[in-house]
């Protein structure tokens, strides 16, 4: 397929061929890929024409890092495309109940946001991976500086949800946890393609490696 936009971390990609897996890949990885399940884009430096991906299995400890040719991608779903999907499923797990509850709060940010992690995977595939204790993983794209005061207000607005919410602010330089940015620490951990580093401003690259 022709990708109209660059792939980004947390995008779900279809089309990974089993033959592209390394020889040391566990059997469950080959099984999952063979079933046509999507892989998720992760942060890592790769050669041009390739993308770093992760394969997820049934359990939390089943995660496998791999790389995929962009030319093999047959379908791409971004976290933002999954927000409306919650309207068409039974919200029988806390993570989905929380998503429905906090949706107006995030819509009020007037910034692109989406669903990642287990909730995003289940909404995109209808494969049952959520459980009673699943967190709700979200992303919020903030191309411009998202103030610490605004971050703290958002953390407060998300309190009381049916499950723990892990929201990552996606900046042009990487990702930072909303709760960490809303805190009082001078430096926060910025996760980028070339590694993690402690920064005082996730929108300005200037700092030291973690």
Q: Each PLM stretch: what is its role?
A:
Residues 57, 142-144, 171:
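Non-catalytic surface loops within mature trypsin-like serine protease
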Residues 121-125, 132, 180, 190-192, ...:
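Generic structural "secondary-structure junction" signal
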Residues 159-195:
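Conserved catalytic core of two-metal-ion nucleotidyltransferases
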Residues 103-136, 140-146:
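Active-site nucleotide-donor binding segment shared across nucleotidyl transfer reactions
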Residues 1-118, 151, 155-163, 167:
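Helical scaffold of the NTase/Pol beta-like nucleotidyltransferase catalytic core
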